């Protein structure tokens, strides 16, 4: 059998995730606390995680749409603190943008670009991710022939959906 397509996950495969997400999360939370000081009390407890769980329980497909889920967590918390829907949506949108900016401030593992360049010469390369990183925004999209995310497919690995989409490139 000849290998034609090589796929990659992104987080913790091409770059370390934990530090990046923690910094992005802190930036978004700091912004919200600067706008609504009482939010700090909720964001420093397990209440935030509880809201994540409640939203996923209410709509299980939300687990595939991390950006939308994060926005709704922010919005839910802000509204619980007395912000109007309009205020909560505005602040949540701004906080999500801050999070996404931070989420894309990362450093690839050593040698990643060199290896991708070598593999690109011989194989079709693709991305299959449950995360919400944007390879175009990261400037590495030129290495890949395709990219599928859980948000885009409304399904998460290890479900077969991602892999079936990748097979379309064989």
Question: Where on the chain are the PLM-derived regions?
Answer:
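Short, compositionally biased strand/turn segments
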Residues: 22, 122-123
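Substrate-recognition "cap/lid" segment bordering the active-site pocket of phosphatases
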Residues: 105, 126, 131-170
């Amino acid at each position: 059998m000849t290998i034609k397509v090589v796929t990659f996950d992104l987080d913790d495969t091409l770059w370390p995730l934990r530090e990046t997400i923690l910094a992005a999360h802190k930036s978004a939370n700091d912004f919200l606390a600067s706008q609504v000081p009482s939010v700090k009390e909720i964001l420093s407890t397990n209440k935030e995680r509880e809201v994540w769980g409640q939203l996923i329980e209410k709509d299980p497909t939300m687990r595939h749409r991390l950006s939308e889920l994060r926005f709704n967590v922010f919005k839910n918390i802000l509204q619980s603190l007395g912000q109007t829907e309009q205020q909560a949506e505005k602040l949540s949108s701004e906080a999500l943008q801050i999070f996404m900016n931070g989420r894309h401030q990362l450093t690839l593992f050593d040698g990643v670009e060199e290896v991708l360049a070598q593999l690109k010469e011989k194989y079709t390369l693709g991305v299959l991710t449950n995360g919400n990183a944007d390879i175009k925004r990261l400037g590495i999209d030129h290495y890949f022939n395709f990219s599928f995310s859980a948000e885009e497919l409304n399904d998460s690995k290890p479900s077969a959906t991602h892999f079936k989409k990748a097979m379309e490139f064989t």
